[in-house]
Amino acid sequence: DLVRSRGLGDVYKRQVNDQWMYHTRLYAAANYVKTRDDLDLIQLNSFGCGLDAVTTDEVYEILTRSGKIYTCLKIDEVNNLGAARIRVRSLLAALRAHDRKQAVREILPSSIQKPVFTKEMRKDYTILCPQMSPFHFSLLQAAFNSCGYNLEVLPNDNKHAVDVGLKYVNNDACYPSLIVVGQIMDALLSGKYDLNKTAVVMSQTGGGCRASNYIAFIRRALKKAGMEQIPVISVNLSGLESNPGFKLTLPLVKKVAYGAVFGDILM
């Protein structure tokens, strides 16, 4: 709160969608701490909140990219804090060892370079879309393809996709995020697609749900797998992101709306 109230650590390009003031304070504090040799940060959170999966990943990236040690303590509603004390003592020991090395830190940005989906890419790129509703999404695929896109709805919404998602997504995140990211990564790792001619599309509401940060989950997974060159297209109506090669035109919106209605009827 002190860092945020004094405007410290504010100039920071985030990977994630900043949804709550709680997030804003954490990111501002981490961004300030990474610039100081006399400060370190311990993040405290509770068990079971999917939003914490977003913040822990982002704070970790901010600190570790600049050579700081990241520590997160999960504290449930219990009186015994013995485990937390052990973690703090371990952090202090690690800091002392780090100081003895006298390593010179380089302060780096933690944001991921976001490839843009251009008009030229629209001609020959395959756009992968995770399967979230078998009735609706088969119709949405036809709607997009009739408007000049080469969109493919993935058929791999199964347990294997979840297992792949567990490798690339913070395991405190919700189940839908695991299967969405898992489908995408499973497809990209299959060897079926040219990774230099493939993009990914995902909706982004911009609201309070962690689904607003599925885009960030996908980009982080692509980075872990060495596929940063793949554009991730955000489908949103609030101007969160834009791509010159992907536009929600009136004919496309009408076809998508028809597809949603017919999907409801068929279901």
Regions found by a protein language model. Give the residues of each.
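Single conserved hydrophobic/aromatic residue that forms the stacking wall/gate
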Residues: 1-12
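Generic long, charged, amphipathic alpha-helical segments
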Residues: 10-26
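Short, surface-exposed amphipathic charged segments that create phosphate/polyanion-binding patches used
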Residues: 13-15, 84-93, 168, 244-258
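Metallocofactor- and cofactor-centric catalytic cores in central/energy metabolism, strongly enriched
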Residues: 16, 23, 40, 82, ...
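Extended, charge-rich low-complexity interaction segments
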Residues: 28-48, 99-114, 181-190, 195, ...
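Peripheral docking tails and interdomain loops at the edges
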Residues: 34-37, 45-118, 123-127, 219-221, ...
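Extended hydrophobic secondary-structure segments that form protein cores and membrane-embedded regions
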Residues: 199-204, 232-236
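Internal gly/pro-rich beta-alpha loop/helix module
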Residues: 233-267
